[in-house]
UniProtKB/Swiss-Prot annotation:
Polar residues composition bias: residue spans: 33-48
Places the protein is found: Cytoplasm
Its job: Cell division protein that is part of the divisome complex and is recruited early to the Z-ring. Probably stimulates Z-ring formation, perhaps through the cross-linking of FtsZ protofilaments. Its function overlaps with FtsA.
Disulfide bonds: none
Descriptive protein name: Cell division protein SepF
Natural source organism: Lactobacillus delbrueckii subsp. bulgaricus (strain ATCC 11842 / DSM 20081 / BCRC 10696 / JCM 1002 / NBRC 13953 / NCIMB 11778 / NCTC 12712 / WDCM 00102 / Lb 14)
Keywords of this entry: Cell cycle, Cell division, Cytoplasm, Septation
Biological processes per GO annotation: division septum assembly; FtsZ-dependent cytokinesis
């Protein structure tokens, strides 16, 4: 009778409580293992997709450039990375420097899967991948 009284008020045999605690510990360990295998979406991540800036809802833009020195090529390439088409006029640049800029922009266009076309004497059109050009200038 003494044991029934202890069991009724929870002071009796602790075997059932120990089994429940062991089950909960095992369950918690499994849950921690599953959570540790999930990829984290940290805001501190240093990896950024090139295509991250492509989802802009604003209108598409065409940027006009007349570079004078080779260092202007970096700004032109940055606009391509931002999904803007570019018309480049090399008439104010010597031929050797213009060739170097065209090579730099061609590499950028190739990396982005874009396109570059000569549309006039010393004038080029460079476009990111989602632009289409039709027609020819003669």
């Amino acid at each position: 009778m003494n044991n029934k009284f202890k069991d009724f008020f929870g002071f009796g045999d602790n075997d059932s409580y120990e089994e429940r605690d062991a089950y909960e510990e095992h369950y918690d360990e499994q849950e921690e293992m599953q959570n540790s295998n999930r990829p984290t979406n940290s805001r501190d991540s240093n990896v950024v997709s090139i295509k991250a800036g492509q989802a802009g809802s604003g209108p598409s833009k065409i940027v006009l450039y007349e570079p004078r020195v080779y260092s202007d090529a970096k700004e032109v390439a940055q606009n391509l990375l931002n999904q803007r088409a570019i018309i480049i006029n090399f008439s104010r640049m010597d031929d050797a420097s213009a060739r170097r800029v065209v090579d730099f922009i061609t590499g950028t266009v190739y990396a982005l899967n874009g396109e570059i076309q000569r549309i006039g004497d010393k004038i080029f059109l460079a476009t990111p991948p989602k632009f289409e050009t039709d027609g020819k200038i003669t």
